[in-house]
Amino acid sequence: MKTCLRCRKDYPQNVAGNMLSTLRKEQNQLTSVLTGIHILRRTRLKNWLGEMLEARIIQPSISPYSSPVLLVQKKDGGWPTARGLPSLLQAHGTRQVPNSRDRGTVG
């Protein structure tokens, strides 16, 4: 069932997987609360995101259709190139999202 949630009070208090979403009504922007992350890692993540914003590696979006991107720092301390879903699908030559379970790995 599709539901259009127009303001914060319409959101359920507990969503499956403990991911709480909020709608910033004034900006029409969906955001996800960082849950399940230790407070020290959360602080580091916020600092890294702040640094990447300042360096213009990433940019904020107020589009209701934007997708979140997860960046994982490489072992050498660098950051991978973030690619959008269309270019990822084109690189794999498929219209389906690649899945780690398809390769027989645990994920």
UniProtKB/Swiss-Prot annotation:
It comes from the Eukaryota. GO terms for cellular component: mitochondrion. Gene3D superfamilies: HIV Type 1 Reverse Transcriptase, subunit A, domain 1. Keywords: Mitochondrion. Residues 83-107 are annotated as: Disordered. Its main location: mitochondrion. A stretch of 270 kb of the mitochondrial genome is duplicated within the centromere of chromosome 2 resulting in the duplication of the gene. The expression of the duplicated gene (At2g07682) is not demonstrated. It is found in: Mitochondrion. This is Uncharacterized mitochondrial protein AtMg00850. It comes from Arabidopsis thaliana (Mouse-ear cress).
